[in-house]
């Protein structure tokens, strides 16, 4: 599932559509179960056509087109969605096409193999109600160590599970939670209330470092190949994963531990028992 680095890469890749007008909205006939559109296509087409895209933003794991009407088009890739400028790998999984001003071939595409993505057109009031601060936590790249500590220090939940709670902080999913905790030297089962004050600083530094490095590498394209950037190119951060999907392999941090896999909240977690001891006594992993 695309997480913050992948969605931020998508956002940057399509940033050039700012200033374009939406001249047409199409949902290709594929014979597949359609993705969730809100409102329904006829209303969506009417409300979008003629709108100018003022900016391209990101909200957690969502791409946001800011329109001159004040409305926001929210594109949520979910498991396998891609936001593309170029032709997709195939047209059988092409779910939405926005025809743009600036040339007959200019378009913005949403392509999704599994069809779990969601596209919503929201007013400012609807955005605040559905994705405002009460529903979505601060962005993972912007939250401070003190704010993260305030939100989690009394929680009994394991830190790995808490990091993936989008109401606590937005953008981190299963992959980057494992990588961040390895960087910070924190065991994924460590209860939030047992994390020391100085360790919150280490954790927030690790969050920023891992996410920014992943963005610089244009995200992670895993073995299933589902994520690619707006030009349909693979990301490169998967080559730098220290723990994710490396069960049984030597730790790339300490060189002595063997990466273990456990299940938390029905998701796989990967960690090094040496770099991330259950009772933490040392600093961040190098």
Task: Annotate the PLM regions.
Residues 1-286:
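Structured catalytic/nucleic-acid-binding cores of DNA maintenance enzymes
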């Amino acid at each position: 599932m695309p997480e913050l680095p992948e969605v931020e890469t998508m956002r940057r890749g399509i940033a050039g559509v700012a200033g374009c007008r939406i001249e047409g909205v199409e949902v290709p006939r594929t014979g597949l179960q359609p993705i969730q559109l809100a409102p329904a296509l006829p209303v969506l087409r009417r409300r979008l056509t003629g709108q100018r895209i003022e900016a391209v933003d990101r909200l957690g794991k969502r791409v946001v087109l800011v329109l001159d009407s004040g409305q926001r088009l929210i594109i949520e890739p979910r498991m396998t969605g891609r936001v593309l400028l170029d032709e997709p790998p195939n047209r059988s999984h092409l779910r939405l096409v926005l025809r743009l001003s600036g040339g007959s071939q200019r378009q913005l595409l949403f392509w999704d193999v599994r069809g779990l993505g969601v596209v919503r057109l929201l007013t400012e009031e609807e955005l605040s109600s559905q994705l405002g601060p009460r529903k979505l936590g601060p962005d993972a790249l912007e939250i401070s160590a003190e704010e993260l500590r305030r939100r989690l220090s009394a929680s009994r939940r394991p830190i790995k599970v808490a990091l993936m709670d989008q109401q606590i902080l937005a953008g981190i999913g299963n992959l980057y939670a494992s990588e961040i905790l390895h960087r910070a030297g924190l065991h994924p089962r460590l209860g939030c209330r047992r994390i020391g004050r100085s360790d919150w600083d280490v954790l927030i530094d690790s969050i920023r470092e891992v996410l920014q490095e992943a963005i610089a590498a244009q995200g992670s394209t895993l073995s299933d190949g589902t994520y690619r950037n707006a030009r349909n190119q693979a990301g490169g951060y998967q080559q730098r994963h220290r723990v994710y999907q490396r069960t049984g392999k030597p730790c790339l941090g300490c060189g002595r531990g063997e990466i273990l896999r456990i299940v938390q909240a029905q998701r796989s977690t990967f960690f090094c028992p040496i770099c991330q001891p259950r009772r933490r006594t040392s600093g961040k992993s190098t």
